């Protein structure tokens, strides 16, 4: 049985994929019973780093709705993923010492749970600068998937296969001689416009005894 580990899974903030397009149904259950919680008006994208001081920062409507059917709290508008997480996205895991410690501890726990063998496949979806995969030895087959890899390539260990794109199973099929023993999605699952489709595609490339580890923020604790 495939083991899917969720940390603070569905009660999260969802940011999605079409610039400033208002949704009319829940991203999780497709219910139309959406109740507006608050509206903060038009806001700039906080993860967008400027190339020059006169560059325009993309913005969009920041309002939240609550699904009365499945209880998912989510953004009312969708945003273009290529703009939010393209070449102007500025976050790097390696700049934060506490994050590196967290990722290292996570890798140790996953190794223990998964009982990894040589050449087992590990896929990190949203791999950023490769920090998490760097805690796995070269004896494993490692794949990082992230739309910012092009500009962060120099931070990746040479043995890590890099896919400079958003996750779709067809993008990684050519690298698969077998399915993955571990797939991780760290602080990116809430960015999905279609989380159920994403989950199915992860399932399709996961071994029957594999582990999918998802980590997200938990809204009640954030408040």
Language-model segments: residues:
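A short glycine-rich, Lys/Arg-flanked "PGG" loop and its adjoining helix->strand segment in the class I
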Residues: 196-211
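Conserved SAM-binding strand-loop segment of SAM-dependent methyltransferases
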Residues: 158-170
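A conserved beta-strand element that flanks and buttresses the S-adenosyl-L-methionine
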Residues: 184
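Short, glycine-/aromatic-enriched active-site segment of Class I SAM-dependent methyltransferases
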Residues: 46-48, 214-223
